[in-house]
Amino acid sequence: MQLRVHPTMDCSGRSTSNIERDSDLGDDLSHGDRTDDEMRDCDSVDGEHHQLSAKAAIAARLSHTVSGGGGSFASPEPQTELPLSHHHQLPPNHPLNALGSFMGIGGLHSIPNLQHSDVLEKLKMQVRDMKVGLMEQDYAAAAHAAAFGANMLPTTISSGFPLPHNSVAFGHVTSSPSGGNGSSYNGGTTPTNSSNSNATTNGGGTAGPGGTGGSGGGGGGGGGGGGGVGGHQFSFASPTAAPSGKEARHFAANSASNSSTSSEASNSSQQNNGWSFEEQFKQVRQLYEINDDPKRKEFLDDLFSFMQKRGTPINRLPIMAKSVLDLYELYNLVIARGGLVDVINKKLWQEIIKGLHLPSSITSAAFTLRTQYMKYLYPYECEKKNLSTPAELQAAIDGNRREGRRSSYGQYEAMHNQMPMTPISRPSLPGGMQQMSPLALVTHAAVANNQQAQAAAAAAAAHHRLMGAPAFGQMPNLVKQEIESRMMEYLQLIQAKKEQGMPPVLGGNHPHQQQHSQQQQQQQHHHQQQQQQQSQQQHHLQQQRQRSQSPDLSKHEALSAQVALWHMYHNNNSPPGSAHTSPQQREALNLSDSPPNLTNIKREREREPTPEPVDQDDKFVDQPPPAKRVGSGLLPPGFPANFYLNPHNMAAVAAAAGFHHPSMGHQQDAASEGEPEDDYAHGEHNTTGNSSSMHDDSEPQQMNGHHHHQTHHLDKSDDSAIENSPTTSTTTGGSVGHRHSSPVSTKKKGGAKPQSGGKDVPTEDKDASSSGKLNPLETLSLLSGMQFQVARNGTGDNGEPQLIVNLELNGVKYSGVLVANVPLSQSETRTSSPCHAEAPTVEEEKDEEEEEEPKAAEEESHRSPVKQENEDVDQDMEGSEVLLNGGASAVGGAGAGVGVGVPLLKDAVVS
C-alpha cells in the first residue's frame, strides 16, 4: 500500500495527542478544541514539518497495522496523482460499494480513480451528514452495521496501534488487527490518525482518492491507509497537494480550522450541501481577478489571513447582483468616507452603491452592504484603521432605526398638528405629543416625568401596536385608531384604578404601567374600602398583573396624560378607521374569542349583550359605574375619572385601539364570568357579564371573580373618580368623549336592553339600530368634534347629585341633566336616572355595590321607561346623542345601553 502524506499538512493536525471524537463527521474529527484554535492561528499550509513527521510515523504504524505490515510509506512529497493499488471493481462488501448503495450514489467503485475535489468533497459532506465517522466504538459499530451491513463490521473494532482514546484509527480491520482501543472504523480504509484529520473521518473509504487539493484546498491531507477488505488491498492516499497560489493558502488556512476536511470548501459544504470547493475557489478567484491591482491581492491576502486568525474564516463570499461582492472596493469606499459608523450616520450608502456599480434596482442594497461589511470587513477595519468601536457602531445602527421609525410618525405628527385642539384639550395636551419618538416606549421611565412625554410614549406604543396589526385604511384612520387605542388603554387603567378606589392615572408611557401602579394603590384602597371581598380579590389579581406590567406613575401625571390623550382623541377630526371601529363594536361579544382584536370583540359584544340579559345586566352594572363616572360629572373632580372609567368608553377605546387588551386581560379575568372576555373586557366586562347592574355586578363579581374591577369601578372607582378627577370640565369632555366612545357603550346598550326586558326590547331594537349607526368610528368622529361643558354641579330637587351638562356635537347643542344613580330607593325615585352609568355614580357615593345588586335590577326596570323616554330623545338625536351619552341614544333606544354607557341625560334638549 502506498500512503503519501503531503508535508504541508500543518494546521490540520497539530496535536497528535489531544484528539476528541466528534459525533458529527462534519466537524474537525482529528483535533481537539485546542488544536482547533491552534490551527486557526496558522495562515498558510506550508509549515510544521516536524509535526508532519510525527503524523507520518503514526500513519505508517497505522497502515502497517491495517494492512498487515505490507504498507510502504512513501516519503511525503506533493503529488498530483496517487497510485491506487486496488481493483477498480471493489468487492461487493467494500465500504465504497456499500456506501454507494446506501446513499444511492452510483459509480463509487471508480472513486479512487477520480482526482476531483468536488466529488470528493460532496461525498465527504454526504457521509458526514450521515454522521458516519468518529463515534464511540459501540455507536460506531451499530451505525456501521446499519449503514453498511453487519457483514462488513470488523470482528473487533480496534486500531492496530495504541492511540489516545480519542484518536481515530480508521481501517478495515477485517484482517485481525492487534488490540487497541482506538475506534477503528470499518467504513474507512484510511486510518485517520489523530493528527491526520483528513480523509477517513469522512466515513469509510470515501475520503481517499482525491486529486490535488482533494480533501482540502488547504491540503491538510489525510494519511492514507490500507485496509485489507476481502483480500483486496485498497490503498488510497488522501489528496494532499494544495492548490497553488494565495487562494490555496487562504483556503488551506481556512481548511486548517476544520481538519476533518482540511478545506474551506468542505467547511462550507458541511453547512450548505452542494457548496463545493470548486465553486468557492471560483468565487475567490473572481474576487482576486476583478482587476490587476497589486494592492487588491495584498488586501485580500491580509483580509483572509486576518479573519482566519481571529477564528472567523471567510467560508463564503457575499454575492450581490449575481456577482461576488467586491470586498476590496467596498472596504476602500467605506474607509474613504470615514469608516462604517460615519457612513451609517451620514447615510452615504448611495454613494457606495454607485461606487460598486450595483444596480439601483436592488431594494435593500444599503442594508445588505452594511451587514456584509459588518460581517467580513468591520473587524478588519477596527484592527487596521481603528476608526470606530463596536459600541459606536451599535449606537449608529440604533440611531438609524429610530430615525426610520420617526419618519413613519411624520404623518401622524402632521395630523396631530392639524387637529383642532379643543380648549380643554389644549392645556392638557402640550406640544410634546409631536416630539413623541419610539424611544418614549423604551425610556418610558425617564419620560414619565413629563406628561407630554407620557402621552407621546402612549401614542408611540399605540402606533407600534397598530403597525403590528394590518393597516386599516389610510394613515388618518390609523392615527385615529391609535388615538382610540390610547384612549381605550387609559380608560381601562382608570377603570381599574377607580375600582380599586384609586384616582385614574392616565399619564405614563404605558397605561398598563399606570394600571399596575394604580392597581397597587387600588389594592390598598381595596383593603381600605373592602366593600366586596370577591371584588377586592379580583382587584388584587388585576393589581398584581398590573404591577408586574408597569411601574407606578404619579397620579397627577397620569391624569394629565389621560386628559391629553382624551383631547387628542377628541381632536382627531378624521374619523377613526371606520372599519376598525365598527368591527370592534360588532365583535364586542367576541372579546373573549379574539382578545387581540378589540374592534372585533367590541362589535361582537355589542351584538351579544342582547342575547345575554344577565351578563348584560352585569355589564350594565359595570358600565353604569363608568356612567356614574360620567355621571360623577355630578362630582366634577370625579367626572373625568368616571368618564375614563366608563367601561363603554374603555371598551370603545380599547376596541378602536385594540389596545387595552393587556390591561383588559386582567379585568377580563374578573369579568370572565360567562364569557371569555377579551383583554379589552374592561368595558367589555361591563358588556358581557358585569353590566347586568352594579348590584348584579357584585354578584357577577363574586361569580366571575373578575368583575370585581368593574364592580369596584361602580363603587370605588366612581367614588374615586369623583374624588380624584381634578379637572371636571376636562373630565366631562373626556366623559362625553367616552360616551362617544360608547360605540362600546352601545354594545352595553344592547346588554342593557336585555336587562330592561320585554318592554325595553323595542327600545333595545332602537338602541341596536342606534348602536349600529354609531360605529366606534362614528363615535370617535362625534367625540372629536364635541364640546362638553358642565354648566352646574349640584343636587337636584330631590337632593340627588346631578350635573347640568351642555354638549355641542356636530353643530347641534344639547343640554341635559345627569343624575347620579343612588341606592335602590334613590334609583327607584330616580326613574329618569335610568342610566346604569348613573347607578355606578350613586354606587360611588354609596360604596354599597352589594346592596345595589338588587337595586340594579330595579334600576334597570326604571331605566327601561327612562330608556323608552330616551328613545324619543335618541330618535331625535340618535347619531349625536348616542355618541354623547355613550349611550344617550342607547339610553332612549336601549335604556340598558344608557345605563351601561353613561348616566342618562334626563332632559336631553336639542337647542
Curated annotation (Swiss-Prot):
Q: In this chain, where does the modification Phosphoserine occur?
A: S30, S44, S592, S594, S720
Listed GO cellular component terms? nucleus
Loss of function: phenotype: Flies show axon guidance abnormalities in mushroom bodies and pathfinding errors by photoreceptor and subesophageal neurons. Female flies with retn defects are strikingly resistant to male courtship and show male-like courtship of females and males, especially as they age.
The entry lists its GO molecular-function terms as: DNA binding; DNA-binding transcription factor binding; transcription cis-regulatory region binding
Q: Which residue ranges have biased composition labelled Basic and acidic residues?
A: 19-34, 601-621, 854-870
Looking at the UniProt entry, the stretches that span the membrane are none
Compositionally biased residues, Polar residues: 570-600
Q: Where is the composition biased (Gly residues)?
A: 202-231
In the UniProt record, does the keyword Phosphoprotein occur?
Answer: yes
Q: Name one Pfam family in it.
A: ARID
How would you summarize where this protein is expressed among tissues? Present in the pharyngeal muscles, hindgut epithelium, amnioserosa, ring gland, midgut-hindgut junction, posterior region of each brain lobe, longitudinal glial cells of the CNS and the salivary gland duct of germ-band retracted embryos.
In this chain, the stretch annotated as Disordered covers 1-44, 67-87, 172-274, 501-633, 662-775, 826-877
What InterPro entries does the annotation carry? ARI3A/B/C, ARID_dom, ARID_dom_sf, REKLES_domain
User: Can you give the residue ranges of the REKLES domain?
Assistant: 731-825
Q: Which SMART domains match?
A: ARID, BRIGHT
Q: What does this protein do?
A: Transcription factor which is a downstream target of gcm and repo. Directly or indirectly activates the transcription of locos and pros, which are essential for the development of some glial cells. Plays an essential role in defining the cell shape and migration characteristics of longitudinal glia that enable them to establish a normal axon scaffold.
- Full protein name: Protein dead ringer
Identify the species of origin: Drosophila melanogaster (Fruit fly)
Question: Where is the organism placed in the taxonomic lineage, from the top?
Answer: Eukaryota, Metazoa, Ecdysozoa, Arthropoda, Hexapoda
